[in-house]
Amino acid sequence: MLPSQSPAIFTVSRLNQTVRLLLEHEMGQVWISGEISNFTQPASGHWYFTLKDDTAQVRCAMFRNSNRRVTFRPQHGQQVLVRANITLYEPRGDYQIIVESMQPAGEGLLQQKYEQLKAKLQAEGLFDLQYKNSLPSPAHCVGVITSKTGAALHDILHVLKRRDPSLPVIIYPTAVQGDDAPGQIVRAIELANQRNECDVLIVGRGGGSLEDLWSFNDERVARAIFASRIPVVSAVGHETDVTIADFVADLRAPTPSAAAEVVSRNQQELLRQVQSARQRLEMAMDYYLANRTRRFTQIHHRLQQQHPQLRLARQQTMLERLQKRMSFALENQLKRAGQHQQRLTQRLNQQNPQPKIHRAQTRIQQLEYRLAETLRAQLSATRERFGNAVTHLEAVSPLSTLARGYSVTSAADGAVLKQVKQVKVGETLTTRLGDGVVISEVSAVTKSRKPRKKA
């Protein structure tokens, strides 16, 4: 028999659609943490990746209009926290989530905040060397801002006691971990500056995770360190731990113990300095006593030497010594004067103008001879060129032509006659012959006929 009520029968499409609606309406938005794998970004700009943990995984999509708000580039293996909607891709029946927002999870988020704050403060110049204060040398009082129960305080006090037991230490106890720690650290720094009891501050704590050290990555703490008039030595964690406070502080020490080393003087060094000072004092006293003794001996000797006879003998001896010195000085002076005179005579002989005059005269004679020879040569050449020119002129001169029997006739205006048409009857002409001039009057003009050319 058939049951009284038939069960609902779904098609595959309807089943997938029903499941999708149930997921979207019943689950809504959820927060999911996991590790990114298989991250891809096609040309569309959408992100496709898988979120997984130790035992499961889920496919994810983050569309371009959502991923453009993400402030970091997701990497394979990165732990993230996403806000997403659960859905189902109906054509394939694939269950997936649509990511709306993404941020690093755990230390990843803290590291991102660390880098952002570091870049911000660096851009403002809080890390610049020009703002760093010099540490006092030596320090007369050290202030320590840390937990009163932490190992860092114990290490600092132990080092200071070993190196410089007489150095005063003022402790400003504060929390170094937790939500209240940044505010307490800031107040401790401000209090130390207000009381102005110490000339250097150590701000720090022992090692720990990034979350444990996060108070020293707080912007308020960084700005308080930067504003401190008292030089600040940061001593946070171990040598590999670097916080924002390290960048802002006037000096970064890798550990609290190292910070104590930096601000204190070595006791052994102090003892050596004291011993050196005592030795210098003893030497000064010995020198002073020896000097006084020598002075006393001199005075005593002078008193013994004050007898008149001794004084007279000393003066006689002094007079003889002075006479010898005077004679010796006069001889030396005369000798030096003679030598000086000889040098002057030699210099004068060297400066005698007679040899120079003789050389100059010889040079002038040579130049005169060369000039006369040059002029004679140039005159001979000029004469030869002139003779050649005269011969050439005579060869081409009209006078030579006239001497051979030719004549030149010119009109009254001086124009040379070349044709009979230039002459009129009754005109006066001038004819130049080889030995004179003939003036004549034209009585008739006859033009020669040109000979006919043979046919």
Swiss-Prot record:
One of its GO terms (cellular component) is exodeoxyribonuclease VII complex. It is found in: Cytoplasm. Its main location: cytoplasm. One of its GO terms (biological process) is DNA catabolic process. Keywords: Cytoplasm, Exonuclease, Hydrolase, Nuclease. The keyword Repeat does not apply. InterPro entries: Exonuc_VII_L (IPR003753), Exonuc_VII_lsu_C (IPR020579), OB-fold_nuc-bd_dom (IPR025824). The keyword Transcription regulation does not apply. GO terms for molecular function: exodeoxyribonuclease VII activity; nucleic acid binding. It catalyses: Exonucleolytic cleavage in either 5'- to 3'- or 3'- to 5'-direction to yield nucleoside 5'-phosphates. Its EC number is 3.1.11.6. Heterooligomer composed of large and small subunits. Belongs to the XseA family. Bidirectionally degrades single-stranded DNA into large acid-insoluble oligonucleotides, which are then degraded further into small acid-soluble oligonucleotides. This is Exodeoxyribonuclease 7 large subunit. It comes from Escherichia coli (strain SMS-3-5 / SECEC).
